Regions:
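Conserved phosphate/anionic-ligand binding catalytic regions in large, soluble enzymes, centered on
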Residues: 40-60, 145-146, 232-244, 300, ...
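Phosphate-binding and adjacent anionic-ligand microenvironments
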Residues: 288, 292-294, 315-317, 335-529, ...
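An N-terminal, well-structured beta->alpha segment
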Residues: 8-105, 196-224, 236
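Gly/Ser/Thr-enriched, mixed-charge loops and adjacent short helices
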Residues: 12, 35-40, 44, 153-279
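N-terminal small/polar loop signature for handling phosphorylated ligands or for N-terminal nucleophile
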Residues: 89-152, 247, 251-306
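Short Gly/Thr/Asp-enriched flexible loops that form oxyanion-binding sites at enzyme active sites
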Residues: 101-109, 152-159, 303-321, 358
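Glycine-rich phosphate-binding loop plus the immediately following alpha-helix
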Residues: 158-187, 322-345, 350-359, 413
């Protein structure tokens, strides 16, 4: 075994670690040296979003010690950044060890003299963002790995606006965390009196905030019997979504029993991700059985929402995040216009890999559409930047996330579920489904279709392979894709844009990010982006055609599918 790895292992075996941890290390030495090497070959990186990794012993795993060291670094930065009393909010999801990690986090903060508002039990991530603003905290942490498989856990760090860390704070916190060289530098206990348990009072304030997002409460009264099927996929959504739907006025809500109990083993699914058809399978079956109007599913920390509706043939389909975002954007913008409350400085915000239909729709409604890097922290940063100058209405991205209004600063599946049900009620009152409304928007703004493929590369070699793929695209970018010339080559890492046809160059006015985009003459857009939280590289595809009428939908839909397949083949990604 590599000497540096062995040294780290010896440090844990001989250091101030509990006996169970040492026993687990010795067991791995005997039974799985390869797994042991992976657990210690690097330090689990405190990235710009915090920690995310497999649970277990070692420097490259989520455990008490890596969580404690991260919290000590973050605590040091908070105390250096704010004079006077510093306070934080701490929450967690339904994953195995999430409560333990949240309590560890709270204890370390308190031992550093920081006041802690700790949720008494599991709660949705968006409520953590809300709590930071509600209590006027300087920061916050939620222990969650969002939609990752059950073996994972994570630690997301937030700033005083309720958003995840952005520059300069993200890099500065990373530096402080990296300074913590040993678990002996962590203040583990003392200051327990600074921890205050929170729950029902914050829940009520949050629910009132969500109720205020309703656009047409009278429509809900007319359509209160809308048949809704909801699955929390063994996660935190169960703590708030049923209450919120009831408060909105919906009376016919069926919760999928098999997935209603919070359980970190996610026994009915492999990936607790509402983007996955298999994950939504039980919910789809229940929706069919009940002849429901709408199916909704939230991931374990209830920041992503999946939606099922009947298509133009009456068959149940799952909408993707782009379709959901477009429908929500349009609903809110049209409602503001029809109610006479639209403002000349209204804006929506989306991300660089989200459908181009967002821009077309914004233009059609006379509002600005800003594009930021992937992740809601960048949407939140843009809101902060434009505060007092422009009016934020809604933001969303392709990864099944929506953020409605500016009272919280992270994606929120709880408010999204409520709004999507209201949208379904609104369309039902007009005698159509959400899918039929989507087709109407395609006719108006163009038929945009997107797809995503993820290539997984695990372990030490995987990172190198992903880096090599990105370097290959950078050094030898395609001149044309599927027969259409590339007219924009966007390198967000270098913040450079280039038109290979004319030689024109420009600067991209966004922070650096390891993303490459190729836009072709026929309007196709291909984006390559290594995941920040999983051992994957993601390729996003967006294509477009005109749609003259609803009767042409199936033909054009099939043609767009063929176009995406041809692009994937042309890029050698089959």
């Amino acid at each position: 075994m590599d000497a540096a790895i062995q040294q780290k292992i010896d440090n844990w075996l001989n250091g101030s670690f509990d006996q169970a941890t040492k026993d687990d290390i010795r067991k791995l030495q005997q039974e799985s040296p390869t797994e042991l090497a992976d657990a210690f070959y690097r330090n689990l990186e405190f990235g710009t979003g915090g920690l995310r990794g497999l649970m277990g012993v070692g420097t490259n795993r989520m455990n008490k010690y890596t969580v404690g060291m991260a919290t000590q670094g973050y605590a040091n930065y908070l105390k250096a950044s704010f004079a006077g009393e510093v306070s934080v909010a701490v929450a967690h999801d339904s994953r195995n060890n999430s409560r333990f990690f949240a309590e560890t986090t709270a204890n370390v903060f308190a031992a550093n003299g920081i006041k802690v508002y700790l949720f008494e039990s599991l709660r949705p991530t968006p409520e953590l963002s809300f709590a930071i603003r509600h209590f006027g905290c300087q920061g916050g942490v939620v222990c969650t790995a969002s939609h990752n498989p059950k073996e994972y856990n994570g630690y997301k760090a937030y700033w005083n606006d309720g958003a995840q860390l952005v520059p300069p704070h993200d890099k500065n916190v990373i530096k402080e965390v990296e300074k913590i060289a040993s678990v002996d530098e962590v203040k583990w206990s003392g200051g327990e009196s600074l921890i205050q348990l929170i729950g029902a009072e914050v829940d009520q304030a949050y629910i009132e905030m969500v109720k205020g997002l309703s656009v047409y409460p009278d429509i809900i009264r007319e359509q209160q019997d809308l048949k809704i099927v909801y699955t929390p996929i063994h996660g935190t959504g169960i703590t708030l979504v049923p209450q919120v739907l009831k408060q909105f006025g919906f009376t016919n809500v069926t919760i999928v029993d098999e997935q209603s109990t919070p359980d970190g083993n996610f026994p009915t699914v492999v990936y607790p991700n509402p983007e996955e058809k298999e994950t939504m399978g039980i919910g789809l079956a229940r929706a069919k059985q009940l002849d429901a109007d709408i199916l909704l599913g939230t991931d374990p920390d209830a920041d992503r929402v999946g939606i099922g509706v009947k298509d133009n043939h009456g068959e149940w389909v799952l909408m993707n995040g782009n379709q959901t975002a477009v429908l929500a954007f349009n609903y809110l913008l049209e409602a503001r216009r029809s109610k006479g409350i639209a403002q000349s400085n209204d804006m929506i915000i989306t991300t660089i890999v989200t459908t181009g239909m967002a821009d077309a729709l914004a233009e059609g409604n006379g509002v600005k559409c800003y594009r930021v890097l992937t992740g809601f922290k960048w949407i939140a940063e843009m809101i902060r930047e434009k505060e007092g100058k422009e009016n934020y209405v809604v933001g969303g991205e392709e990864s099944f996330g929506l953020m409605i209004g500016d009272k919280i600063r992270d994606k929120d599946a709880v408010s999204a579920v409520a709004l999507l049900c209201e949208m379904a009620a609104y369309e039902k009152a007009k005698g159509r489904t959400l899918f039929e409304k989507l087709i109407e928007l395609y006719i108006q703004y163009g038929f945009y279709k997107e797809d995503l493929i993820s290539i997984t590369k695990k372990g030490m070699d995987g990172q190198q392979q992903i880096a090599a793929m990105m370097e290959q695209y950078r050094s030898q970018p395609p001149v044309s894709i599927n027969g259409s010339p590339v007219v924009q080559l966007l390198d967000y890492e270098r913040r450079k844009g280039l038109n290979p046809q004319t030689g024109e160059e420009w600067t991209i006015d966004l922070p650096k990010s390891n993303v490459l985009q190729f836009i072709t003459e026929d309007g196709s857009m291909i984006s390559a982006r290594p995941s920040g939280t999983e051992p994957k590289i993601k390729f996003y595809f967006s294509v477009k055609e005109n749609l003259s009428n609803a009767g042409e939908f199936d033909r054009v839909n099939k043609a767009l599918d063929g176009k995406i397949k041809a692009i994937i083949a042309d890029m050698g990604l089959e």
